[in-house]
Amino acid sequence: MWGLLLALAAFAPAVGPALGAPRNSVLGLAQPGTTKVPGSTPALHSSPAQPPAETANGTSEQHVRIRVIKKKKVIMKKRKKLTLTRPTPLVTAGPLVTPTPAGTLDPAEKQETGCPPLGLESLRVSDSRLEASSSQSFGLGPHRGRLNIQSGLEDGDLYDGAWCAEEQDADPWFQVDAGHPTRFSGVITQGRNSVWRYDWVTSYKVQFSNDSRTWWGSRNHSSGMDAVFPANSDPETPVLNLLPEPQVARFIRLLPQTWLQGGAPCLRAEILACPVSDPNDLFLEAPASGSSDPLDFQHHNYKAMRKLMKQVQEQCPNITRIYSIGKSYQGLKLYVMEMSDKPGEHELGEPEVRYVAGMHGNEALGRELLLLLMQFLCHEFLRGNPRVTRLLSEMRIHLLPSMNPDGYEIAYHRGSELVGWAEGRWNNQSIDLNHNFADLNTPLWEAQDDGKVPHIVPNHHLPLPTYYTLPNATVAPETRAVIKWMKRIPFVLSANLHGGELVVSYPFDMTRTPWAARELTPTPDDAVFRWLSTVYAGSNLAMQDTSRRPCHSQDFSVHGNIINGADWHTVPGSMNDFSYLHTNCFEVTVELSCDKFPHENELPQEWENNKDALLTYLEQVRMGIAGVVRDKDTELGIADAVIAVDGINHDVTTAWGGDYWRLLTPGDYMVTASAEGYHSVTRNCRVTFEEGPFPCNFVLTKTPKQRLRELLAAGAKVPPDLRRRLERLRGQKD
């Protein structure tokens, strides 16, 4: 859907010739006058934003670039140049405040900006605490004025991408109630997220109040005049303005002064604020809940991540192993933490499970959750936690916290609130890794339409297309590394951790109807995938909060916070679909939070939201049947034997030791084990709600032809009884 949305942006209405239009959006600035705010103190002077640097003809040009995604190729196109016309010079009420654009602060400097976000983006601030002077519609109300909120495909519905004041509103304002006295230190703004329109504020003032009736403004140190803060020059880039002096108040207002000509005063915002102690405040909210686990709750760049993983390995050397599956385009290693009672060894009958995070580098919560999970498992194992001990003794857990470390480093440098919605999403080749796996859906569906599945074309372990294996194929090194990893280890269960929504999506991710934007496209194992998705969603505290509002433009709670991926938006080349069709592994996508890159003060609560879900999901690998397929004569396991379940058109295969795991929901199943050179065997296997997979072992007997091949290959003579049997089978007499 993102590709469709971005492509449609090319057909958006042309932007007017001038930026920075004030108040009623008429070219030039109105004379300074009185700002009448209901219940406010009198007379605040308007101040125009400082005009941009002039070119030779008296105008300033800004090049806006948008990303157009066509199929799998990422193409960068230049939009039409936008001309900034210098407004008529007027005496301002005070000097313009210098903005702090995204990306200008190093991580260490970011800590000095003072306060963390109040919680507009993370939804910690409820809709009832957001107000405005006016709104164009309900879908453009103040509850939509949250940093990084995304609109739906259509404007004018209930889910538009900003707060927008009415055109007739002469003195627009957007107000946030912190709930109690708070130290405000800064403001971050964006324009309107829309496929069809360009709207953003170019300058604004800030006011404060303790009772929402008496207001005072933020002032410059040098002049003592009201400060005018320069805002945005495009819809998406977050712009941070630190206040000249932090202010303690309960309410904060943003008053747009100028905005894009031809547009409307529209903005999305986040407020930087610190709580303050006030013994007279009788309505103090309960402190934000966190976690009592002794874990490292902060964001980790590549160097810090390596250091943390090494510390965990040194603390728990008997249950951990760190290994690399390859390198990113920039040469950063893709590190995996393996956790098991026998790390580095595949034990017969012990399933392999994995979590993958950071496929999109700017979706940072999954990365931190996996780093927290490995710390937690180590800590609890040392404490003798029986649940953790059982997990580590019954399965091998593989944690890949950063599949796209290059993208993450870009996002980390920008900072959690300034990275925006998409920067750092792609790898350094501008490849979206979740569209980069081989499309195996199309050849499977074409073969099904021709009646070739499963007799001619298998319904599992589909081979890579020839084009995908060519040296010049557009396949990211990160993708190649993960595919090799999938082939090397017999994974059974996986989850791909993303961010930006609160929902669990399951395969298929790609619609069966070509070019359909969305369409319900279930797999043959739809019941299993729905179960897995429901287990995670039902164990996630945030997803189960019935009082929470939707993140952006869809309310997934009406479906239990799960959805078929293709019925949400089509994703050709997804890792989920590839994992299901190329390996034995069942994988879902978990969208962990409305905020892709939450501030680190949100991490303790996000850990509590997901801790039980992460553990419970891993335990689902016990659901279904498991066993070993052995050779009757040698009693050795048979590798690559096929396990077929009657009524489910998708098979799995045995690992190199002959062991297998087949995820199934409770019920009775007729299961067939077959292997080349062996007679097939079918038996009934019952799956119940009891813990642990139902043991369903098979012993296969070689066919006479296979026995003959093996004898001849060994140079032995064919026994008379076998020779006579073969001749009888051929219809010949001795």
Curated annotation (Swiss-Prot):
InterPro entries for this protein: CarboxyPept-like_regulatory, FA58C, Galactose-bd-like_sf, Peptidase_M14, Peptidase_M14_domain
Domain Peptidase M14: 298-621
Enzyme class, spelled out: hydrolase
Annotated stretches, region: Disordered: 30-62
Segment forming the signal sequence: 1-20
Cofactor note: Binds 1 zinc ion per subunit.
UniProt EC number: 3.4.17.-
Annotated positions binding Zn(2+): H360, E363, H498
MF terms (GO), sorted A to Z: metallocarboxypeptidase activity; zinc ion binding
Keyword Nucleotide-binding in annotation: no
Glycosylation sites: N57, N210, N220, N318, N428, N472
Composition-biased stretches (Polar residues): 32-48
Cysteine pairs bridged by disulfides in the record: C115-C274
Keyword Ribosomal protein assigned: no
SUPFAM superfamilies named among the record's database cross-references: Carboxypeptidase regulatory domain-like (SSF49464), Galactose-binding domain-like (SSF49785), Zn-dependent exopeptidases (SSF53187)
Residue ranges annotated for the F5/8 type C domain, each copy included: 113-274
Cofactor: Zn(2+)
Function summary: May be involved in cell-cell interactions. No carboxypeptidase activity was found yet.
Family indicated by similarity: Belongs to the peptidase M14 family.
Protein name (Swiss-Prot/TrEMBL): Probable carboxypeptidase X1
Gene: CPXM1
